Amino acid sequence: MHYSHFYFIINNTNMTINAIPKLFATKNSISLSIVIFMYLLILVANVKSDSSFNFPNFQPEALKKLGFANDATLKNGVIQLTKKDAYGDPLKHSAGQFGLLKPIRLFDQTTGKVASFVTEFTFSVNSNGRQDHGDGFAFFMASPKFKIPNKNKSEGGFLGMFTRETALYTKEIVLVEFDSFANEWDPNPSSNLGIGSHLGIDVNSIKSVANALWLNDFDDITVGKARIEYDSSDKNLKVLVTYSEKGAFNGDSSLVYNIDLTTFLPEMIEIGFSASTGDLVETHDILSWSFTSNM
């Protein structure tokens, strides 16, 4: 089953104002203009800045709110970001993305208010018993102008969001990566992070500005749960991951980075997930997703 691609294009909502009688337009055009202007200000002031949604699983009706690109598909209530064969085994050289069609407001330039948000999701990354596997997935926040690259250029360590040309400099994109393979731009194997899987925060580049060890289990029956928080008051972006059956965030893996997101992202942003495989493979499935923001 194939779904329409997700191109990070905001769907504008048109607001229609009833026609104004010509009598008022000719005699009181200035006064009427002021009234209309004040009315529109009231409308804008009362627009709800909070955003929230919850997908405990992904049913076909979710397609009304979600967009897909490249290899990402919805199957049996689960979003598969990268390709599998008929037996469920992961395939090489795959990349896929999905995200919310409706943009999220990160901040209000007029009032200066900035949103705080929490997003939680459950995921499964299965190596199918391979000792060497890759490449990982990421939660992204990006400008609506950002264009998802072709999978042939963004596979492998680029996590489906970068290419060789854009890897070290891309505008208006922030990723939280769940990286299962250490590339040359990742933490040095001699560092305290060791070799292999790690959490990372990427700002306009595939090279992370912050890293932490990703303690994981790539068994096919293991489900991980992640929580990403942004507190606009202290500007901390926090990542928590657990494999606890109770879903409690008990510090299995964590990463905190101080960042003013408004410096790197526009008022309205697109949010979603991306993943890729290269010569090494693993599955990348998102099982549930919720998001709440308030300003």
UniProtKB/Swiss-Prot annotation:
UniProt induction comment: Accumulates in roots during colonization by arbuscular mycorrhizal (AM) fungi (e.g. Glomus intraradices).
Compartment(s): Membrane
Regions that span the bilayer: 23-45
KW Transmembrane helix (keyword) present: yes
Gene3D superfamilies linked: 2.60.120.200
Cystine pairs: none
Domain of life: Eukaryota
Name assigned to this protein: Lectin 11
Species per Swiss-Prot/TrEMBL record: Medicago truncatula (Barrel medic)
Extracellular compartment segments: 46-295
GO terms of biological process kind: response to symbiotic fungus
Major localization listed first in the record, in broad terms: membrane
Membrane topology, record value: Single-pass membrane protein
InterPro entries (alphabetical): ConA-like_dom_sf (IPR013320), L-lectin (IPR016363), Legume_lectin_dom (IPR001220), Leguminous_Lectin (IPR050258)
Its job: May be involved in arbuscular mycorrhizal (AM) symbiosis with AM fungi.
Gene Ontology molecular-function annotations: carbohydrate binding
Keywords for this protein: Glycoprotein, Lectin, Membrane, Transmembrane, Transmembrane helix
Keyword Glycoprotein: yes
Glycosylation sites: 152
CDD domains named among the record's database cross-references: lectin_legume_LecRK_Arcelin_ConA
Family that this chain belongs to: Belongs to the leguminous lectin family.
This protein's GO CC annotations: membrane
Cytoplasmic side: 1-22
